[in-house]
C-alpha cells in the first residue's frame, strides 16, 4: 500500500467518523495533513515508511469501525451516531461472564 492510499483512507474514515461535527472534522483533517506533510520529505526507500503507513491504516480502521460520537440530549443521556460501518458486538463474553470455568489465566488454571 502506498502513502497516498493510506492518506485517502484516513481522510475518508475521518469524514465518516466526524460527520456533522465540523470543528472536530476540521481538526482531524489538519492533523492528518500535518502528519503526512511532516514525513513527505523522507526518501521512498526509507524503512520507517511502511510501519507509518500501517499505523495510518490501523487508525483509519479504528475511526471507521470503533468510534461513535454522541450528543448530549439532557437528563444524562446521549444520542449516538451509529453508522453502517460501526462495529456491533454481540456481548457474548459479557453474557457468559462468571458461568463455568476459567479458560486459563494466572492463578485459576
From Swiss-Prot:
Location (main, coarse): mitochondrion
Coiled-coil residue spans: none
Ranges annotated as biased composition (Basic and acidic residues): 83-93
A cellular component annotation (GO) from this entry: mitochondrial matrix
InterPro entries with a match to the protein in the record: Complex1_LYR_LYRM7, MZM1/LYRM7
Keyword Hydrolase: no
The keyword Mitochondrion is annotated on this UniProt entry: yes
Family note: Belongs to the complex I LYR family. MZM1 subfamily.
UniProt-recorded name of the protein: Mitochondrial zinc maintenance protein 1, mitochondrial
Organism of derivation: Verticillium alfalfae (strain VaMs.102 / ATCC MYA-4576 / FGSC 10136)
Gene of this entry: MZM1
Amino acid at each position: 500500500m502506498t502513502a497516498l492510499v493510506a492518506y485517502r483512507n484516513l481522510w475518508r474514515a475521518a469524514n465518516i467518523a466526524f460527520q456533522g461535527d465540523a470543528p472536530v472534522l476540521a481538526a482531524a483533517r489538519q492533523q492528518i495533513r500535518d502528519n503526512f506533510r511532516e514525513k513527505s520529505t523522507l526518501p521512498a526507500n526509507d524503512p520507517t515508511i511502511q510501519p507509518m503507513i500501517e499505523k495510518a491504516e490501523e487508525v483509519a480502521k479504528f475511526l471507521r469501525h470503533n468510534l461513535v460520537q454522541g450528543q448530549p440530549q439532557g437528563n444524562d443521556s446521549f444520542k449516538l451516531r451509529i453508522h453502517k460501518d460501526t462495529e456491533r458486538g454481540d456481548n457474548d463474553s459479557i453474557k457468559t461472564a462468571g458461568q463455568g470455568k476459567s479458560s486459563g489465566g494466572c492463578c485459576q488454571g
